Amino acid sequence: MASQGTKRSYEQMETGGERQDATEIRASVGRMIGGIGRFYIQMCTELKLSDYEGRLIQNSITIERMVLSAFDERRNKYLEEHPSVGKDPKKTGGPIYRRIDGKWMRELILYDKEEIRRVWRQANNGEDATAGLTHIMIWHSNLNDATYQRTRALVRTGMDPRMCSLMQGSTLPRRSGAAGAAVKGVGTMNMELIRMIKRGINDRNFWRGENGRRTRIAYERMCNILKGKFQTAAQKAMMDQVRESRNPGNAEIEDLIFLARSALILRGSVAHKSCLPACVYGLAVASGHDFEREGYSLVGIDPFKLLQNSQVFSLIRPNENPAHKSQLVWMACHSAAFEDLRVSGFIRGKKVIPRGKLSTRGVQIASNENVETMDSSTLELRSRYWAIRTRSGGNTNQQKASAGQISVQPTFSVQRNLPFERATVMAAFIGNNEGRTSDMRTEIIRMMESAKPEDLSFQGRGVFELSDEKATNPIVPSFDMNNEGSYFFGDNAEEYDN
């Protein structure tokens, strides 16, 4: 692990800032959050949304998607060059839900992208404020992570669907920058690389010419990002080997799949940030909260405090359970889709149940669903304790684990042993003799085999009372180690479809 001295903190990545001290970081993250809030308030005014409608998470998501679309330069350019029937490249929109005569109604709105860019810049002191856009992307990514399984995508790239704990950020757009790269899981980076190598195998010109040179630079950069997530020398050395390959092919794909499996036990470091829906920031700004003056951190108590007193609503389909919908959104808000359920449940102060047992579908409503039969209910997003978000995968040891997901990726810096069954993971290595046998592989397998069940595999700080803002009195929760900790265990969650 590179020493902290050479790494920019997340908040610096998030705000594109150079080295800053803690106060400056808190202020610049606060400025970013305040900008999102001001933008949201202005959009609600332009759309004439009532206070209640402005607190509806589905409306928040539509407004967020509109601003992301307005700033998606590559797509905008593509749309202008390839006009498709019935799609105006200069406009963006989506469903807005309004409460009319005691019923919810859907209204499809269309806006000039230019107009939305104007509102966004105005809310952000005239700047493009890309950090705020990335923040919104990460919130959408965290929501997808909590809602969908990526089984199909995993299988397509030759990985095991049980490796879903490595897939954080798999739906983040490419343009999400350093802050986006920080939150991507090992499996996500892996998959991007495998897709790239496969294209190279199928398309002779992929690595050639001027374009090929750019492709190569992107390939090496992605390799370096993935290498930076691994915590052991042998895993890093294997990544060097993949990066330096003259002509990446099947051997590299095998190495990458091997590394992804190894990450189930020798976990990578992946950042976690609490990114909340724009309407939450809007509510706070509207009530007079000055984020820039107060400062804000995505990895501390601030998001917990914000959620303690924000009332957000959601549309609920006739057979959905509002409490389950709340759990889904709570997990998304704290980037906790791959966290151990026992830890999440302790912090939330309510039992957190696996995805397969939730009676709820995604938050977004498809255009063919009938909204008039839907009710709205308050999302319960409060917590009993708070904990610092971690960027470390923790040191590892062995535990009984499930068929559905054979590892977790810790979100909260809380001490516990991590559930995984060594036999299950090691079985994934049997009979795979393709790729190169090398000292590195042997070394990695040796480390995995010697991972001990007794060790506390994740040394964290513990959780804190919400009154303990300075994190002075850690409470170390005790967990029933026989209980299952995986969210996607034995699951039938929907697949994510673009």
Swiss-Prot record:
Q: Which family does it belong to?
A: Belongs to the influenza viruses nucleoprotein family.
**Predominant subcellular localization, coarse grouping:** virion
Spell out the subunit comment: Homomultimerizes to form the nucleocapsid. May bind host exportin-1/XPO1. Binds to viral genomic RNA. Protein-RNA contacts are mediated by a combination of electrostatic interactions between positively charged residues and the phosphate backbone and planar interactions between aromatic side chains and bases.
Q: Where is this region: Disordered?
A: 1-22
Please name the gene that encodes this protein: NP
Q: Where is this motif: Unconventional nuclear localization signal?
A: 1-18
Task: Tell me one GO molecular function of this protein.
Answer: structural molecule activity
Query: Sorted alphabetically, which keywords does the UniProt record give?
Result: Capsid protein, Helical capsid protein, Host nucleus, Host-virus interaction, Ribonucleoprotein, RNA-binding, Viral nucleoprotein, Viral penetration into host nucleus, Virion, Virus entry into host cell
Q: Per its UniProt record, what InterPro entries does this chain match? A: Flu_NP
TM annotation in the entry? none
Q: Where is this motif: Bipartite nuclear localization signal?
A: 198-216
Instruction: Give an example GO biological process.
Output: viral penetration into host nucleus
**Is Cytoplasm a UniProt keyword of this protein?**
no
Location relative to the cell:
Virion; Host nucleus
Q: What is this protein for, i.e. what is its function? A: Encapsidates the negative strand viral RNA, protecting it from nucleases. The encapsidated genomic RNA is termed the ribonucleoprotein (RNP) and serves as template for transcription and replication. The RNP needs to be localized in the host nucleus to start an infectious cycle, but is too large to diffuse through the nuclear pore complex. NP comprises at least 2 nuclear localization signals that are responsible for the active RNP import into the nucleus through cellular importin alpha/beta pathway.
User: GO CC terms on record?
Assistant: helical viral capsid; host cell; host cell nucleus; ribonucleoprotein complex; viral nucleocapsid
Which source organism does the UniProt entry give? Influenza A virus (strain A/Swine/Hong Kong/127/1982 H3N2)
Protein's recorded name: Nucleoprotein
Pfam families, sorted = Flu_NP (PF00506)
Spell out the post-translational modification annotation for this entry.
Late in virus-infected cells, may be cleaved from a 56-kDa protein to a 53-kDa protein by a cellular caspase. This cleavage might be a marker for the onset of apoptosis in infected cells or have a specific function in virus host interaction.
Q: Where is the composition biased (Basic and acidic residues)?
A: 8-22
Task: Read off the SUPFAM superfamilies from this record.
Answer: flu NP-like (SSF161003)
